[in-house]
A protein has these predicted regions:
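Active-site-adjacent structural elements in enzyme catalytic cores
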Residues: 1-227
Length: 227
């Protein structure tokens, strides 16, 4: 099921169902070692999916949830490797979009929901984008209009004493530091892997050329002559 959030459209599956997760990875063409984010309706469900909730995590959750923030936390025992990519951490988000909230509240559990696009492609921000990307490959698309934010959620590693910004997004680094009451720490080689942080990601279908202005004028003139 594809559904709208305030950031981008998500492609959702039961985060506790290995078969549903396998189908999710297959439809997206996503590597199975690339973690997905678990979406919840309410912070009261957090203890089912994460453990050792740090003071930093509590402060950020109070400030930005529901909203476009994903927190990386230590995973609870029930959370499988298919969600975390084999890591000891899990990404959790509580979206603010009314349709997403209604869906999550009705479902009553965690929904694993990466962006509703094929792996490596640009994220969908409308229901039409989802249909264009997947055709009939998605069972149901909930149309909530265009996403308000239009980029994916900010991801913060909140497993330690200081927040670590793993993926920039709508929430700025300064806002994170102010809410956490601590300066951002730099990611290290041991930081958790996070969705949307590979070297090649969000690639448009249209080719992009980078060139000097003189060469650009020559190319434009050539294309004009060719019609």
């Amino acid at each position: 099921v594809a559904f709208p959030t305030e950031t981008v459209y998500g492609l959702g599956a039961d985060a506790g169902n290995p078969d549903a997760l396998a189908k999710l990875y297959s439809v997206k063409g996503r590597p199975t070692d690339h973690p997905v984010i678990v979406h919840l309706a309410d912070a009261a469900q957090l203890g089912e999916w994460a453990r050792e909730i740090t003071p930093v995590a509590q402060k950020l959750a109070r400030k930005f949830w529901p909203g476009p923030l994903t927190l990386i936390l230590k995973r609870a025992p029930r959370v499988g490797d298919a969600v975390t990519g084999g890591q000891d951490t899990v990404g959790i988000r509580i979206p603010s979009h009314a349709i997403a909230h209604a869906l999550l509240e009705k479902f009553g559990g965690g929904v694993a929901a990466p962006s509703a696009n094929r792996f490596g492609r640009v994220s969908a921000t409308t229901a039409a984008h989802v249909r264009q990307e997947f055709g009939d490959g998605v069972d149901l698309v909930l149309d909530g209009g265009a996403s308000d934010v239009g980029i994916e959620s900010t991801i913060v590693d909140a497993t330690g004493a200081a927040p670590v910004l793993l993926r920039p997004g709508h929430i700025s680094a300064r806002e994170i530091e102010e809410a956490a009451g601590a300066p951002l720490a730099l990611p290290t080689a041991h930081s958790p892997r996070a969705p949307g942080t590979l070297a090649a990601h969000y690639a448009p279908a249209t080719p992009l050329l980078v060139m000097e202005s003189d060469l650009l004028r020559e190319l434009a003139a050539t294309l004009t002559r060719q019609g």
